Amino acid sequence: MGDVVHTMPAVSDIARHRPDARIDWMVESAFASLPAMHPSVQRVVPIAWRKWRRNLLKEQTRVTIGRVRSDLRAEPYDLVLDLQGLLKSALFSSQAKGLRAGYDWASAREPLASVWYQQVATVDKSLHAVTRSRMLAAAHLGYTVQGEPNFALKMPDPSWMPPSPKPYVVLIPGASRPEKLWPEERWVAVAKAVAARGLEIVWMWGSKDEASRCVKLAAQSDGEIPPFLSVEHAAAVIARARACVGLDTGFSHIAAAFGVPTVGIYCDHEPGLVGITGKAFVASVGGRGKSPESTQVIRLLDDALSSAMRRSTW
């Protein structure tokens, strides 16, 4: 999910510099609602690779993949741009009809992906993911990256909101891998700090394990736990928050993309290349072997809340 969010500014750049361009976006089906929130995306092409790879020998899977391939090849594109630089993204982009473009061998996250491209560009691998995507698009479409990243997301309508009318802070304690998790007692300390500041808490989750973790944390502190929400409806709740504190997960990046003051907590890798990025206050804290203390996160949360109050008075 984070990769999808990080690509949004590149799409905004393309639309700005090539206003006559029609932009279609191929994406994992679970995240298809995210590109649909960008006003410059005309069509979203969903693929279910996570599901297909477990059932490649089944006839239905092959039939479904064949339909997607036929759909892609029915549309002649001037440029098929792979902004991920992975083998799987290169493979699927090669199914579309058009000039295939991407990173060169030295720049791609998976160098072998560059073999599939007909046109390549060099982009420094030490840059943030958002900047890399913007620079790759600029290199292949002949313009220069200018200004701050513009995520340009349309705010979706919510299907659920916390019952209290008070402003709320979204806490996101779940992650895709155990190594990313932050100690529970530190989450409880942050939650109590939020409550002490007169704000509501919404514990956001996306899987059964994450829901269980939220229930456990809320029992030790306070807060509302929403029912299961689609990515679109979760984004609607996150986008309306006063601030957000979350792990290195897609929901945290969504918060920052919507301009919510956001503190990102990193526990298993350095945040430099994938740190929290957005137009409002953002902070990325921690790193591999450097799990931050709750006091540090609470200080940053106070900075985030202060920035939110300043923005509300503009």
Question: What is each residue range found by the language model?
Answer:
Residues 1-314:
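Catalytic machinery of carbohydrate-active enzymes
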